[in-house]
């Protein structure tokens, strides 16, 4: 019986772990990848999606296409039981729990932005980690530009056209342009 490798997360780490393990171990293992979406997001292109220089479809690729020899599940991870080597996921329309057994587990779920540490961020900040984030930022900027276009008051126009980028990482720098 083949060794079962279960990978949680289909971002850069999960994607490249799956690809590398398949290349290295070939048919000696059965690899399954669980991800919230059934596509891979090339995050370095999200600022271009937000800016409108490329469409959203150019920043994503179906995981099943990229990882042809690996089973892909679009699902939410609920829990991990290391004692029984079982991961519980919710998938499909009815979101019934499914239990997946593994011999080896790769946890590559990525990170989330915690905006709760600074007053006002949860209400006013936008993040840049997902395709929806890029779309939301684009819509917000367009809304602010349209607001500035119709107002006659210089202070309102200035406020509508003032944006603050927090973070000097790749996404922050690229979002600034």
Q: What role is predicted for each listed range?
A:
Residues 1-3, 71-164:
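FAD-binding core/adjacent interface of flavoenzyme oxidoreductases
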